[in-house]
């Protein structure tokens, strides 16, 4: 049998009431982090964070909806078809407007072997604090 995994988004384990889908674990990806984040309209509680602790860079793209990504005091409007890379030291935060958003988040540490955070494994409890959430992809 071919080494391939195919799943629909709703087949991945959800945490935070569906706010995050454990896509990396569900597909068996081991070389980089990958999650789908869903935020409702007018949501401002997504934690501002950076990745100085693990030097992970992240790439985000919107699958549907729109959001504002705040990085280094600047707002970047994201919609489907737009990709953005954020360096490890930059604090970042998503804020939604009148519509919600579904974001694909990818992350890895340049030049290093990827080590998935425990909470990203299927069946693990979701992060219970902001520090644990900082390694969300």
Language-model segments: which ranges?
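A short, N-terminal "cap"/entry segment at the start of jelly-roll beta-barrel domains
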Residues: 1-33, 40-41, 115-137
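Conserved short histidine dyad/triad with adjacent acidic residue
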Residues: 20, 36-54
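Short histidine-centered beta-strand/loop micro-motifs
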Residues: 25, 46-53, 71, 95-96
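Short strand-coil-strand connectors
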Residues: 30, 70-74, 97
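Glycine- and acidic-residue-biased ligand/ion/polar-headgroup-sensing regions
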Residues: 55-67
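Ligand-binding loop in jelly-roll beta-barrel domains
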Residues: 68, 88-114
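Short acidic-glycine-tyrosine-enriched beta hairpin
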Residues: 73-88
């Amino acid at each position: 049998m071919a080494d391939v995994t195919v799943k629909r988004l709703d087949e991945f384990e959800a945490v935070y009431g569906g706010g995050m889908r454990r896509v990396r674990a569900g597909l068996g990806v081991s070389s980089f982090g990958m999650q789908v984040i869903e935020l409702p309209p007018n949501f401002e509680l997504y934690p501002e964070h950076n990745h100085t602790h693990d030097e992970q860079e992240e790439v985000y793209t919107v699958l549907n909806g729109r959001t504002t990504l705040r990085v280094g005091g600047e707002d970047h409007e994201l919609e489907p078809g737009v990709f953005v890379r954020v360096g490890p030291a930059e604090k970042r935060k998503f804020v939604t407007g009148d519509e919600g958003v579904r974001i694909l988040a990818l992350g890895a540490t340049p030049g290093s072997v990827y080590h998935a955070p425990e909470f990203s494994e299927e069946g693990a409890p979701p992060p219970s604090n902001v520090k644990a959430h900082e390694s969300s992809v």
